[in-house]
């Protein structure tokens, strides 16, 4: 198991521990059997409720630490899972992001087309 919260790791170290292994991710099923993507709209209560239920279904502990970054790894944020859930509009906006578990067991990718996917190593 990898500890991505190690204070000795630089941004480029984190990137090297994650990106080369993205091909190993097993993505959860999405809207149908041909896609791993699901709708990540928070524009109305119904869509937001479906998204939150889907995220809660991933059984991630509220206190679990995650790293959020853009695709260029230029803007890293360290948060607890509960903080992500509490402020989805901040993270699910007009930017591609990766949310990586601090122990590199799972990853979530959001695309600005309001779609998201979740996978595990």
Locate each region found by the language model.
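Structured alpha/beta or helical-core interaction and ligand-binding surfaces enriched in interleaved
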Residues: 1-115, 119-121
């Amino acid at each position: 198991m990898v500890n991505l919260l190690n204070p000795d790791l630089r941004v480029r170290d984190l990137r090297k521990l994650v990106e080369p292994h993205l091909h190993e991710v097993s993505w959860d099923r999405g809207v149908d059997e041909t896609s791993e993507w699901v709708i990540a709209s928070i524009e109305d209560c119904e869509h937001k409720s479906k998204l939150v239920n889907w995220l809660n279904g991933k059984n991630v502990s509220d206190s679990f630490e995650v790293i959020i970054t853009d695709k260029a790894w230029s803007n890293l944020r360290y948060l607890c899972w509960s903080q992500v859930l509490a402020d989805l509009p901040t993270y699910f906006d007009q930017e591609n992001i990766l949310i990586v578990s601090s122990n590199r067991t799972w990853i979530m990718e959001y695309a600005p087309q309001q779609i998201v996917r979740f996978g595990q190593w």
